[in-house]
Amino acid sequence: MSVDEKYDAACELLYRLDPTKVKTHLQNLIALEPEIAEGLLSSIDIPLTIKKDTDANNKEFLCCDYNRDIDSHRSPWSNQYFPELSAEDLKESPFPSEPLRELEVACNNSFELYRDLYYEGGYTSTYLWDVDESTDFAGVILFKKAESDDSKWDSIHVISATHDEEGMEVTYNVTTTVILHLENLSKEQQLSLSGNLTRENSKTVKLQNVSTVEQLVPAHSSSLGSMIEDIESKLRSMLEIVYFEKTLDIYNVLRERNDDSTKLQKEQHSELIENFQKL
């Protein structure tokens, strides 16, 4: 098999396996076929992990493939890698340019407020990187909320910002993936719901009263903030109204319908909805 065929087969297999164990399955596939590791790591979303930034009072930050270099991850708070890389490796490690780093800091501060307001806790991290030598850039905005071991929400927003030739408009493209795991631990019967949902969105914004690089920072952070807020709101509604209701319909068909089982099913569905709304 060619490398492309192995990659396609691995992706197809991962889509059919238990989504709660995707990280384990991914590691096993990479160990089996190391040559497809880079492709799988960049295309398969796994639940976000958390590290502490010892250079920023042990403040926690989220880790994914986009802020990884070798086995270390860059913190958005101190702009350093943890665990610390060697001086030789650090020379080749990716860092945002100074103007983009300023925007990265502003976005992290803005989304911290968003997280407190809409998630009432949890974690958020934003990472940006330069695209060629232009003012265009790309990045990822991460959110993680775990109400308990049984209720987890991870949202990954991969963004790109492209300016027009005159520099008067910027087009934002956002690919969002939500990884959701809900579970009830009822003594009578256990029910879990896991999976991910991916959607793409784009928006073109006119840059008004923006003539310097410094003025671009609040313009970009404001535009991205409103766009992410709108995307997450729509995805939450879609998950709750469409997917949960459809799951309940399928569950009812598969289960034997008697008064006791119907009552139990409704209780389990209500518990899942309640856990979701807490995230």
Swiss-Prot record:
Keyword presence, Protein transport: no
GO MF annotation: an example: actin filament binding
Cited Gene3D superfamilies: 1.20.58.570, F-actin capping protein, beta subunit
Record-linked SUPFAM superfamilies: Subunits of heterodimeric actin filament capping protein Capz (SSF90096)
Domain of life, source organism: Eukaryota
Keyword check for ATP-binding: no
Major place of residence: cytoplasm
GO biological process terms on file: actin cytoskeleton organization; barbed-end actin filament capping; cell morphogenesis
Xref: InterPro entries: CapZ_alpha/beta, CapZ_alpha/beta_2, CAPZB, CAPZB_N, F-actin_capping_bsu_CS
Compartments in which it is found: Cytoplasm, Cytoskeleton, Actin patch; Cytoplasm, Cytoskeleton
Pfam families per the UniProt record, alphabetical: F_actin_cap_B
PROSITE patterns: F_ACTIN_CAPPING_BETA (PS00231)
Any single Gene Ontology cellular-component annotation: F-actin capping protein complex
Sorted UniProt keywords: Actin capping, Actin-binding, Cytoplasm, Cytoskeleton
Protein function: F-actin-capping proteins bind in a Ca(2+)-independent manner to the fast growing ends of actin filaments (barbed end) thereby blocking the exchange of subunits at these ends. Unlike other capping proteins (such as gelsolin and severin), these proteins do not sever actin filaments.
UniProt cross-references to PANTHER family, sorted A to Z: F-ACTIN-CAPPING PROTEIN SUBUNIT BETA, F-ACTIN-CAPPING PROTEIN SUBUNIT BETA ISOFORMS 1 AND 2
Subunit structure: Component of the F-actin capping complex, composed of a heterodimer of an alpha and a beta subunit.
Family: Belongs to the F-actin-capping protein beta subunit family.
UniProt name for this protein: F-actin-capping protein subunit beta
